[in-house]
Design a protein with these regions (language model features):
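A short, N-terminal "cap"/entry segment at the start of jelly-roll beta-barrel domains
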Residues: 1-70, 164-238, 242, 363-402
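C-terminal flanking tails of non-heme Fe-dependent oxygenases
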Residues: 3, 280-286, 294, 317-402
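Conserved short histidine dyad/triad with adjacent acidic residue
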Residues: 55-62, 73-90, 242-256, 273-280, ...
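His/acidic/aromatic-lined binding-pocket segments of jelly-roll/cupin-type domains
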Residues: 76-77, 85-89, 93-98, 117-118, ...
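Glycine- and acidic-residue-biased ligand/ion/polar-headgroup-sensing regions
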Residues: 80-81, 90-111, 247-248, 257-287
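Short acidic-glycine-tyrosine-enriched beta hairpin
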Residues: 109-130, 277-311
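Ligand-binding loop in jelly-roll beta-barrel domains
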Residues: 121-122, 127-159, 299, 307-337
Length: 402
């Protein structure tokens, strides 16, 4: 116990400069003995150093991305060739995207004789249900690499009990049952009940790299998108993240929302611009372009779309000769209901992708953006031998707007 020293005179009490306290989640991952990557993004997760992971039996590295520290846990996991990881269960949700390799996953409830087994390949997305045992198996002669996302940070920070997280016998039977079709692939497209955009209910998506995506057009012309809905979660705009694709030569409108969104590149390559909203919609024109962050990535890379606690504009660009596909990688529910895209308590919410900031939305429409954005994008496309395909009509002010 530290001794408190009362100040004298008018001096303030306590340390004037002190080290930041680590959260329970940070303390947990720092004790795991594997590398921890900190930053805004990664060009390619295959390039991250991996350390031997005693708890799971493979190799891995944690990702502690800016703005996601208390919201979303992430790690890269290598399953050795011809081997399997140790089985585990925990009281938080977890999802996996396969970067490289093929294998199977076994899932079962404690005390149950029923075991679900399904196969995965590059581009597979699947869920490990809360507090269900799961084990990853690699039957090939080369290592498999997977990227995981979960909501361990808010769970560990809230309960502050490792025993509760790892040794809890509660059966979440409304979230995971014994039905044979729990991991049956579903291809039926429906509408999100809140926002009306495309969605699919499934717990296993065999190939999100090549799956057909419906036209959406909200984020950019020709933009395609679908939201995965997983079992046991209320199917609205808060759950599942989304899989999206930009055509060659096109880019998104800049927009902002709370932190937590992590975009993982599935195909093609691109870059993301990030800047604080305080810099305004035209930071380069205002002479503040040096304060804008840029993150490059290819298939297997990723970026924290809204770092710094949120309130950052971010904008995504396809510099491939073909389609540029990403997944907004969800890690499970957190303390924010309504998702990171909705704020306030109004009954009606304006779609942040459709309404510009002058209309009460959270998007910089193409006619409002800084001219530097388009000029730089044209330059990057030329360097890649790709063409600019944005319709010129996108940059015209609507009638009556000045």
């Amino acid at each position: 116990m530290l001794e408190f020293k009362e100040p004298t005179g008018h001096d303030p009490a306590g340390y004037h400069i002190y080290k930041r306290s680590r959260s329970p989640y940070e303390r947990f991952i720092e004790g795991e003995g594997i590398p921890i990557y900190r930053g805004i993004g990664v060009y390619d997760t295959r390039d991250l150093p991996l350390g031997k992971w005693p708890r799971l039996g493979g190799r891995g590295t944690y990702l502690l991305l800016e703005g996601c520290e208390s919201i979303k846990g992430m790690f890269v996991l290598e399953v050795p060739s011809g081997d399997a990881l140790k089985a585990e269960k925990h009281v938080y949700d977890e999802f996996f995207v396969v970067i490289e390799g093929r294998g199977t996953t076994e899932v079962w409830r404690e005390g149950s004789q029923k075991k679900h087994v399904f196969e995965w390949q590059p581009g597979s997305l699947f869920m490990a249900p809360i507090n269900a045992y799961h084990r990853l198996v690699n039957a090939t002669n080369s290592p498999a690499l997977l990227l995981a996302a979960n909501n361990a940070p808010p769970v560990m920070n809230l309960f502050q009990s490792q025993h509760f997280v790892w040794n809890n016998n509660y059966d979440f039977n409304e979230r995971y049952g014994d039905s044979d079709d729990f991991y049956k692939v579903n291809t039926t497209i429906e509408a999100e009940p809140v926002r009306g955009r495309a969605a699919i209910r499934s717990n296993l998506f065999p190939d999100i790299v090549n799956a057909n995506l419906p036209l959406d057009n909200q984020r950019a012309p020709g933009y395609r998108r679908i939201a995965p809905f997983f079992n046991g979660f209320i199917p609205d705009a808060s759950t599942g993240g989304f899989i999206a694709e930009y055509p060659a030569g096109r880019y998104s409108k800049a927009h902002y929302h709370l932190s937590g969104a992590v975009l993982v590149c599935l195909a093609g390559k691109g870059y993301t611009l990030n800047w604080r909203t305080e810099l305004g919609p035209r930071p380069w024109e205002a002479g503040k372009g040096d304060q804008v962050k840029i993150q490059e990535y290819k298939a297997g890379g990723l970026v924290a779309a809204a770092p710094g606690g949120g309130g950052w504009f971010h904008q995504h660009f396809n510099i491939s000769n073909g389609p540029f596909r990403i997944i907004n990688y969800w890690g499970g529910p957190t303390g924010h209901w309504g998702g990171i895209f909705e704020e306030g308590s109004e009954d009606e919410v304006k779609s942040g992708n459709i309404f510009g900031i002058r209309e009460g939305g959270r998007t910089i429409l193409y006619p409002e953006e800084d001219p530097w954005v388009r000029n730089y994008y044209r330059q990057r496309l030329a360097e890649e031998g790709a063409e600019f395909t944005m319709p010129e009509s996108m940059f015209e002010e609507p009638a009556g707007v000045r």
